[in-house]
């Protein structure tokens, strides 16, 4: 897995998650995959592509997501044809949170011919916040994502929280 537990934590106690982008496969068969963690579950693999469900049932109205992160940005050196313009650019990590009134978890498909990624402009989204970093952050640094509510009359049914070692991991 590209996501592993680590004892290297902001407080020096407990555990954290270490997300890494690396090649997953045997020999030349496989693909570059971003380390990630998310609320939801992995459904299945189709070829070398994933099908996931984003979200867990949730009906509260938080105002922010707080945490700590550190990140080592490296130069992008592999990409599919669609994102070749990124080669030579620094990779970017991503964290986002969304509250929505979906009737079920949000299905994500990474296969290019059947791609369905998370859309932060989805009309079901009630509140959203995100952050990106394309610079290396060598020490644990606090972050706060202030949720921007688009509608205060609707009640959330799901929460989606995603952290990825590579914002463009679905395109490698």
Question: Across the structure, where does each feature detected by a protein language model lie?
Answer:
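Short amphipathic, basic-aromatic surface patches that mediate peripheral association
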Residues: 69-86
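Aromatic (Trp/Tyr/Phe) and Gly/Pro-enriched flexible surface segments
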Residues: 1-66, 88-100, 106-150, 154-172
């Amino acid at each position: 897995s590209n996501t592993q537990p680590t004892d290297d934590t902001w407080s020096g106690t407990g555990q954290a998650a270490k997300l890494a982008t690396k090649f997953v496969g045997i020999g030349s068969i496989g693909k570059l995959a971003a380390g990630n963690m998310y609320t939801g579950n992995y459904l299945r693999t189709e070829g070398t592509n994933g099908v996931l469900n984003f979200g867990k049932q949730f009906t509260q109205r938080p105002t922010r997501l707080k945490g700590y992160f550190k990140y080592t940005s490296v130069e992008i050196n592999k990409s599919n044809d669609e994102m070749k313009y990124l080669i030579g650019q620094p990779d970017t990590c991503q964290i986002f949170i969304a509250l929505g009134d979906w009737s079920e978890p949000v299905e994500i498909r990474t296969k290019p011919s059947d791609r369905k990624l998370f859309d932060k402009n989805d009309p079901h989204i009630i509140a959203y916040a995100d952050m990106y970093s394309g610079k290396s952050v060598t020490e644990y640094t606090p972050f706060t994502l202030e949720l921007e509510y688009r509608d205060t009359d609707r009640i959330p049914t799901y929460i989606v929280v995603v952290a990825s070692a590579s914002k463009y991991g679905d395109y490698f």
